[in-house]
From Swiss-Prot:
Pfam families: TACO1_YebC_N (PF20772), Transcrip_reg (PF01709). The lineage of its organism: Bacteria, Pseudomonadati, Pseudomonadota, Gammaproteobacteria, Thiotrichales. NCBIfam families: PRK00110.1, PRK12378.1, YebC/PmpR family DNA-binding transcriptional regulator. InterPro entries: Integrase-like_N, TACO1_YebC-like_2nd/3rd_dom, TACO1_YebC_N, Transcrip_reg_TACO1-like, Transcrip_reg_TACO1-like_dom3, YebC-like. One of its GO terms (molecular function) is DNA binding. This is Probable transcriptional regulatory protein Fphi_1565. It comes from the Bacteria.
């Protein structure tokens, strides 16, 4: 199935992440630690931990760092004071935004998130105000040049839900959150190393924006992602390749 890449924003985000590797690693370690605390340190019995580990490895985190984070979480440590919170709101142009956080101080976090929304021309909403527009799923992305038929065979056999080949030759493999790690591990075992892999929220209907509003939305996303307590930010914007090129 061919189409325009719905995931062009991943390449933009990846470039930013390379420049902020330390902060990204901090967020990944926090996710691994909390996942291990909540579900135990055995990744085979803890799907969330397996997904967190897969994402960490996709971002080139070392095995030693991952193992230390697991031990920290499974042993209790100070991660017990951290809780997960989710905020929903609207950005410029009325776009839907979901912000996942991990915090030891809800009041601090909600204040910072609200300030980011307000500063960027958006507003923080109530629980459930936009979440219904999204579906949680895994996505494993490959740069152009991979063997599409071989990749498809491995992915589908491992439990992938859908595979999309884009006009530039890049490929996205979609999974349920539960099957994400199984599919990624099966692909790696067969020599298919992804360009990006994550469990994300995908909007059922995408918002089409002009460049002016898109720039304002990206500024909001950047503000939110720069907050220490923020783990992930999701939007329903259709970041097409053309739009991302205009955004630079």
């Amino acid at each position: 199935m061919a189409g325009h890449s719905k995931w062009a924003n991943i390449k933009h985000k990846k470039a930013k992440e390379d420049a902020k590797r330390g902060k990204i690693f901090t967020k990944l370690i926090r996710e691994i630690t909390v996942a291990a605390r909540l579900g135990g340190g055995d990744k085979d019995a803890n799907p969330r931990l397996r997904a967190a580990i897969a994402t960490a490895f996709a971002n080139n985190m070392s095995k030693d760092t991952v193992e230390r984070a697991i031990l920290k979480g499974a042993g209790g440590d100070d991660s017990a004071n951290v809780e997960e919170v989710r905020y929903e709101g609207y950005g410029p142009g009325g776009v839907a935004i979901i912000v996942d956080c991990m915090t030891d101080n809800r009041n601090r976090t909600v204040g910072e998130v609200r300030h980011a929304f307000t500063k960027s021309g958006g507003n923080l909403g109530t629980d459930g105000s936009v979440a219904y527009m999204f579906t949680k799923k895994g996505i494993i992305s490959f740069a152009p040049g991979v063997d599409e038929d071989a990749l498809m065979e491995v992915a589908l056999e491992a439990g992938a839900e859908d595979i999309i080949t884009h006009e530039d030759g890049s490929i996205d493999v979609f999974t349920t959150p539960h099957d994400f790690s199984d599919v990624q591990e099966a692909l790696i075992a067969k020599g298919f190393n992804s360009d990006n892999a994550e469990v994300t929220f995908d909007a059922e209907t995408k918002a089409e924006l002009d460049i002016e509003i898109a720039e304002k939305v990206m500024n909001l996303i950047d503000r939110l992602e720069d907050l220490d307590d923020v783990q992930n930010v999701y939007s329903n914007v259709n970041f097409t390749q053309e739009l991302m090129e205009q955004l630079g």
